[in-house]
Amino acid sequence: MIRESCRWPTYPASDHYNPASGRFFNPEPQRVVRPLDAASAVAPMMFRRKDRFPPQPLPVIAPDFSPFRQPENGANGETARFIWFGHSTLLARIGGLNLITDPVFGAAASPYRWMFRRFQPPLVPAAALPPLDVVLISHGHYDHLEEAFVRRFATGGALFVAPLGVEVWLKRWGVPAERIRIADWYQQIRIGHLTLTAVPARHDCARGIGDRNRSLWAGWVLAAAGEQFYFSGDSSYGRHFAEIGRRFGGFDLAFVENGQYDRRWPDNHMFPHQTVQAALDIGARRLMPIHWGMFSLARHAWDEPVRRSSAFARQRGLPLLTPMLGELFDSRSSSSGDWWQNAAEKAKAA
């Protein structure tokens, strides 16, 4: 973990950064999570797995990496394609580039191997991934920024794209400065035929002692070949979603966080009905719920987020995309149906 003695850059003052304290904040204030509330929620999770973990590993499709091994040709207007690895990790072929979001392949979403262990094995080892052009990070929490993954790919050809402050960890783990691109909210980064724009999120960040909110959290807009996608990272519900919708005019597909919520931290993660509302606010033509299917970081059942968000999406008339782990899909793919429900029912019948 990084200690407080680590040197952090100072950035210009803004409506979400105070250079005097060197810390970021949310323009729409968060309710503070009380230590007793956090302890009362987290302590039982260390010992009780019933319903929080699926009874057996979830069904997967062996990933087809062939589109990701084609020569780069972003000028041909190819349709973006994706593979979901669980939680917030997506492999994308977009603008002729191979991009991965918030890659986590290790055993635990914490600095300790025994804490917040994954319940679903990785689809493939990180070493088996196709060549990467871009590693896109939303923020520095352990379930989104993994040191082992960064170190493995630090000296390869990939560019690391992240919000302000995350470069401190990336450099510490061996990524050369020339391979790092950082952005504040609403700043654009152009890589070949792909445009990435950091957008606001309502969250926070900490990895170690004294580093709380030293780095920024963000969602990302990905645009190439006439298609536009939204990746939420982590965010609680807020007015920023409507602003993103006004600025960008809608999205072909939105990957929106959906899981790891709790009434004790209502301003850290969205509840399922808020996930659907956020997708509507930004003008998403289709919603894919993410931030589930790999870790249990809250007390709800492992499949509750997708069950509830699916029901709310149907009520609101919002088309939903729910690919299986490992399935290759694009913004126009047909849904794989309630496969998680079938998995739960089969496990109960066994």
List PLM regions with ranges.
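Metallo-beta-lactamase
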Residues: 1-128, 159, 163-231, 252-259, 308-328, ...
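Cap/insert and terminal regions of metallo-dependent hydrolase folds
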Residues: 2-27, 129, 134, 159-168, ...
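Catalytic core of the metallo-beta-lactamase
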Residues: 89-95, 190-251, 266, 270-274
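Divalent metal-coordination and catalytic microenvironments
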Residues: 92, 102, 139, 146, ...
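Active-site metal-binding loops of divalent metal-dependent hydrolases
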Residues: 103-105, 140, 201-203, 233-235, ...
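Acidic/histidine-rich helix-loop elements
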Residues: 105-122, 205-211, 262-268, 296
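Active-site metal-binding motif and surrounding structural segment of the metallo-beta-lactamase
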Residues: 114-161, 181-182, 249-255
